[in-house]
């Protein structure tokens, strides 16, 4: 069996990567909350280069509270005082995930990763994002760079 660790392992440094390595993982997805140079490892390093990051998980069914009911595949939006809308999606049962109001975008930057992940959640048409990724551009619209540009954030060579 080949073990791959996703972002929920919260691999933020070389020590946590070494722990994954010692437990038989062949690849890890570096936490979006990590600075790009923080994880040194022999494992295959993956970065999420596009996607609205989960901000919070809650056992309270937010969707039911907002929509006055809950069904399969249901979702809702939370709006903050600035007018930003945060998608809320049901995970399983009545557990909810609140996602960032804008996606993290690194599609036009050199991440130094061995593999890159496009993390789709609420996109109606993922094709523009895929095209932007393949041509090393940032897609249209609002986005964040997260922690990535705080450390490095070099433009990709074309």
Residue ranges and their predicted role:
Residues 1-158:
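Active-site pocket-lining/capping segments in soluble small-molecule metabolic enzymes
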